[in-house]
């Protein structure tokens, strides 16, 4: 499409491996940096793995202090509040795994509490992982346990992992996440949204564990912070809705922010052989450059679609949401009028097309998806969730 490739989607902690499935949690000393919503969820989940936990927090009285103190009553937690910033690198002595809360930048260019300690951990070969890595470990472990439980003694069943749909972008993430989950539920799937939208990734895992019912589809809203810290991620389908300059108080520069967004299409996997369906807004050059290395792609935009399976708008007196035929791009299927959306705007029409493209990775049946789309009202406005120490903004 004449768009040059952007910087490769590299993490500041790229060479540290992901968490192996055979990880011995009870013998592990895990350090959690920050105890916002994400940090608290990590702590609760780690307690279930019987890990020994240290928590470092620069605030003397973080918002979740009462819940944190209730958890602190359990012997395997060492709680350290009101620490000077930056955290002393010596804190990482004797630690096996460090989990930074997403709002803490690892970059020395930004005066935050975590960067010096993370640099020391990296130099010493200490494993650093993000909450997305814990989430991925948890769902793989649950699938493995289910496979073992259901198998005959002499038969190993193939691992049946849930579908994972991932959404990122500078704007529109929450609406698209809600849309995709609502559409799939209307189509008969057990779909669970989580991530930058509430509940957090691990709070959702814990709730599903308690219900003894994992969803068929996870619909994840992911911020650039969460993606930057992750060491491995293999979604079923992922979309980057759009990219504009944002959160340069966390990222090294705009290129670093763009690279983090591109990680939604997969981390630690071979892009040339990947089975991930990569979806993007074709009128955003940054998004299209991120998609360029990938094999399976689908686009959406405000003009008519011109590739098989792509989505767009077509003006025929009214504005129609359309999809190009998967066998003949010249044939376009009218899906519904854009004005039939209850959340009516050109921006939400793009969110709706992105949600449809994501859901098509789960089911080819368009009719129930379109019925649900006509009824979708949204209802959750932009929300600011402080995920960590000194994090003033959310939804990057």
Show which residues each predicted segment covers:
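Anionic-ligand anchoring segments at beta-strand to alpha-helix junctions in alpha/beta enzyme folds, i.e.
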Residues: 48-51, 193, 364, 380-382
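Residue-level detector of alpha-helix initiation sites
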Residues: 37, 171-175, 349, 353
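Phosphate-binding loop of NTP-binding sites
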Residues: 47-48, 87-93, 102, 106-282, ...
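Adenine nucleotide phosphate-binding catalytic loops in nucleotide-utilizing enzymes
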Residues: 28, 33, 101, 161, ...
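Short beta-strand/turn micro-motifs composed of small residues
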Residues: 34, 57, 99-100, 195, ...
């Amino acid at each position: 499409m004449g768009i040059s490739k952007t910087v490769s989607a590299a993490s500041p902690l790229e060479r540290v491996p992901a968490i192996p499935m055979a990880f011995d949690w009870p013998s592990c000393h895990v350090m959690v940096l920050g105890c916002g919503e994400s940090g608290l969820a990590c702590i609760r989940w780690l307690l279930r793995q019987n890990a020994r936990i240290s928590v470092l927090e620069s605030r003397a009285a973080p918002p979740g202090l009462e819940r944190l103190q209730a958890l602190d009553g359990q012997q395997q937690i060492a709680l350290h509040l009101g620490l000077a910033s930056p955290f002393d690198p010596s804190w990482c002595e004797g630690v096996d795994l460090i989990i930074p809360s997403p709002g803490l930048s690892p970059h020395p260019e930004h005066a935050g509490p975590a960067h010096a300690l993370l640099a020391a951990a990296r130099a010493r070969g200490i494993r650093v992982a993000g909450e997305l890595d814990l989430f991925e470990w948890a769902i793989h472990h649950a699938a493995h346990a289910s496979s073992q439980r259901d198998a005959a003694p002499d038969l190993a069943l193939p691992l049946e992992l849930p579908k994972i749909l991932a959404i990122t972008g500078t704007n529109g993430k929450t609406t698209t996440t809600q849309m995709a989950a609502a559409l799939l539920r209307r189509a008969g799937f057990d779909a669970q949204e989580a991530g930058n939208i509430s509940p957090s990734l691990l709070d959702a895992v814990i709730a599903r564990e308690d219900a003894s019912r994992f969803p068929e589809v996870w619909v994840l809203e992911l911020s650039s912070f969460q993606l930057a810290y992750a060491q491995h991620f293999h979604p079923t389908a992922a979309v980057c809705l759009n990219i504009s300059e944002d959160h340069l108080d966390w990222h090294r520069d705009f290129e670093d922010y763009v690279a983090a967004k591109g990680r939604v299409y997969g981390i630690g996997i071979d892009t040339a052989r990947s089975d991930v369906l990569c979806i993007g807004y074709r009128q955003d050059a940054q998004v299209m450059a991120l998609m360029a290395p990938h094999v399976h792609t689908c686009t959406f935009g405000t003009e008519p679609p011109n590739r098989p399976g792509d989505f767009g708008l077509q003006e025929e007196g009214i504005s129609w949401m359309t999809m190009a035929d998967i066998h003949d791009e010249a044939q376009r299927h009218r899906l519904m009028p854009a004005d039939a959306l209850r959340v009516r705007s050109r921006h939400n029409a793009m969110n709706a097309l992105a949600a449809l493209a994501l859901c098509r990775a789960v089911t080819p049946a368009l009719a129930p998806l379109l019925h649900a789309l006509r009824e979708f009202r949204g209802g959750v406005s932009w929300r600011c969730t402080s995920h960590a120490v000194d994090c003033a903004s959310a939804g990057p």
